[in-house]
Every structure is written in C-alpha cells, then in structure tokens.
Amino acid sequence: MKRCVNLDWLEVYCFEPVTGVRNADYFRSKGYTVEERDYGTRIYNEMFTIMGTDEWPLLEIRRSPKSSMTNGGIMPMNACHIRLTNRTCYYNDAAVQLQLFLDQHGFMFQRISRVDVCCDFERFDSGDYPQKFLRRYLQNKFAKLNQGRIHSHGEDTWDDRRWDSISWGSDKSCISTKLYNKSRQLREVKDKPYIKQAWLECGLIDNFYDCTKVLEDGTMHKPDIWRVEFSVRSEVKNWFVIEADGNAKKKRSVPNTLRMWAGREQLIVMFASLARHYFHFKVYKEGVRKDLLQDKELFRFRPNEETYKVDRLSSPQDEKKDLERLIAKLNKFAMTYPASEINDAVSTIVAKIEQIQLSRFAQDPYSWKELIAIQQTLAYRLQHKGIDPTSVLHSILTMLDGTVKPY
C-alpha cells in the first residue's frame, strides 16, 4: 500500500561554543534574516527564528537560560534548544541540514530532546480503513500492547459516533503514539501545502489542490488520509528506551542521534521499529492473556521499502498572496507592452483564472472577494494607466471585507 513517512518535529539540546554567544545579532552578522520575539519562554530569555534562503522560517532557537548556573540555577549558561520548523522537517535531508547548521556555527550537540516521525496513508497495509479499525478498537475488538493510557476525540451525532483521533501515553511518557485523521485536520485547523505535496509525491493523491485521486475505473475519489505518529522524548544522550514485546520489565535501548534520522530510508526503519513496539495490537478474546492473543496485522514493512524525494517544498502561503502576485505580474507585463492586444490577453487570462477558481473555491467567501477585487482592479487599471495596481487591489479588498458572500 502507498504510504508517506516523514519527520514532523526535530528539536535538539545544545551548548553554544565558548568562543562567543549565538544570539540574533550574531546570525544577522552572518547574513541571515532573523525574526526576534520581544519576549522569551518559560525557560529561556531569548527566542528567535532564522529564515532560510527562500525567506521562509528555517529553524527556531531558544537561548540564554533564566535559571543558569551563574545565577544559582541548574542549567549551563550556554545551553540552548534548536528546533526545525515544521516545513523544514519535510525536506529529504532535514536532519542533515540541522547537523550542518550546528557544525557551521560551532554548537556542541548534547541530545535530541524531541523527534516526531509519522506515516500517512489511506488504508493500512492489511486493507483496514483507519476509522473502522479505531471504532472496533474502542469497541474492545482489539487490545493494544504498551501505553495503557488513552485519549480519544470524535463527534457524536444522532445517527453515528465518529472517531477522528486517539493517542496513547501520558504527558510524561518518553514515547507517545497518535492515530488521527490528517485530512480533516488540514481542512479544519490549518492547511499545510508541503504536506499535501508529500502526499502527491508518494501517490496518495493525484490533485494537489483538491486532494483527490483517480481510481482505476476512472472515477474521482477524495481519500481520507490518516496518520500514525510517534513522539520520542529523551533525557539521555544518544539513546532512548523502548519496552520490548509489551513487557515493562523487558527494555531495549535504541540509538537516537541525528544520523539515525538522516533520510527517508532511515525514517522508515525507525518508524517500523517504533510501530513494532508501540502500534502492536492483538485480536481480543475474553479471559486470554494479551501476550497469547493472535496478532492484528496492520503494517507490513519490506526490507527494501520504496521511498520518495521532494526537490522543492511548497510554501505555506494562502491563495490571496498567490493571486496578488499573479495579478501584479500580469499588470507589469501589460505596462511594459501597452498594446491593445496585450490588454485583451490579460483580460482573457484573468477570465480563465476566474473560471478555474470559481469551481474550486465556490464555497469560500474569501476567494469570491479576491476575484471581485481582481476584476475591479483590472478595470480601474485599464482606465487609469499610471495607477499602482497593487494599491488599488489592497483598497478594494479592504472595502469588500465582510460584504462578499458565496453563492
């Protein structure tokens, strides 16, 4: 079955070099664009984000501990935490990029404080649909080894009860597990284009915008993509400990260095190892010990698992910015070549954009507002050659706020 394995969180605990502090001004002096927060965190005085070469957030640094040893506290004065942004985690070599950054600026790596690895799929390798499996699990059809504490979320209607997520493990657990409907989260909480791009690259969907795919019989299908996610926290340098075969007294240490998460192949190996211990289910039978029950097979990992690679990530920008940039480029072109046929061509292109966008965003009032604003901006631009189209567009968008409703 098609599946998509990625990092979703990577954070390390480091020491700054003794040769000098690594504050926001240091990175500005090295040519980075830095966004500094006016306040720190509960543990650190400073927090700032370093932008990548594409001007999107690359990583976040928290430094200058409030409880440092020089002030009678417990943390070394040069301690810091460095976290990749969520978008950066979806690069093929995210862990390698982080290691290169640490080496380049002299940080002394201590340990991975948190790493999340996830697998997205429509169905389990066994053919089970995640929502049906989750419902049966909550009906005691299956039993899970390890992590007895659970938290589930869903929706209770008159006709049915739908479960959208479940997590195992407490807040203090070194390893926690989560199964949830990722498609629903992207629709209702926050859209992340780079995640949909990953789905497209590995074949879970065929259409980036609508998140649909064409089945073998030619019909259009909109799959619900689910995610299994393991979150690993460790207080020990280079290792984390897992329970073997559901036995709390039988533990095994697993290497936990950046090298272990360096590429897709390594991610699949680490995910499979965690799934074996923390996504291990049995077919429940009353009166029979868990370790004697029949296994419920869900994932099947092959020795040579196929992986995908992303050459360039989509930027997490909304439709408004895309449309503004497109209109600005069209108007710039029309101003450079002020011929009547150019204006006609621009009008034709915008009409085509309207046709596509109306079918895609017919229920979104913000898209309707944008399209109306584009129409009015182009009309105004054709009548007033010297006007700045961007300022007109912003003025019209502001004027239309709260007034445009979808059909």
Over which residues does each language-model region extend?
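Structured, helix-rich domain cores that form ligand/interaction pockets
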Residues: 1-311, 322-407
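Mobile genetic element proteins and their domesticated derivatives, centered on retroelements
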Residues: 314-319
